[in-house]
UniProtKB/Swiss-Prot annotation:
Protein name (record): Probable small ribosomal subunit protein cS23
Pfam family, one: PSRP-3_Ycf65
Gene Ontology BP terms: translation
Gene3D superfamilies to which the protein is assigned, alphabetical: 3.30.390.140
Protein's UniProt keywords contain Ribosomal protein: yes
Molecular function (Gene Ontology), one example: structural constituent of ribosome
Family classification: Belongs to the chloroplast-specific ribosomal protein cS23 family.
GO CC annotations, alphabetized: ribonucleoprotein complex; ribosome
Subunit text: Part of the 30S ribosomal subunit.
InterPro entries: PSRP-3/Ycf65_sf, Ribosomal_PSRP3/Ycf65
Role of this protein: Probably a ribosomal protein or a ribosome-associated protein.
Keywords: Ribonucleoprotein, Ribosomal protein
Taxonomic source organism: Trichormus variabilis (strain ATCC 29413 / PCC 7937) (Anabaena variabilis)
Length: 99
């Protein structure tokens, strides 16, 4: 997954997911943010990644699996926990937000 970074916007009522591509020493946005539970963020992210045919199946599956883990954590306990705890639980994911 080192070619891509899963980005999470951690909010009180929603969690949002986006993917950046690593380019050189920086990153470039690859997708917009998809919000959960406002919309089906996982399904929207899946469709967006599938539309980019140059992303390997392995990279796509790794990104979607990590997105599943983050969404499940947020649903089960994370929404009531500070973002710093989520950052510790998922160190390979980039977090930002207000919670």
């Amino acid at each position: 997954m080192s070619k891509f970074i899963l980005k999470i916007l951690w909010l009180d009522e929603n969690v949002a997911l986006a993917v950046d591509q690593v380019v050189g020493k920086g990153t470039s946005p690859l997708t917009k943010y998809f919000f959960w539970p406002r919309n089906d963020a996982w399904e929207e992210l899946k469709k967006e990644l599938e539309s980019k045919h140059w992303i390997s199946d392995l990279d796509r599956v790794e990104l979607l699996n990590k997105a599943t883990e983050v969404i499940n954590y947020w649903q089960e306990e994370g929404r009531n926990r500070p973002m710093a705890e989520a950052q510790l639980k998922f160190p390979e994911v980039t977090f930002t937000g207000s919670a």
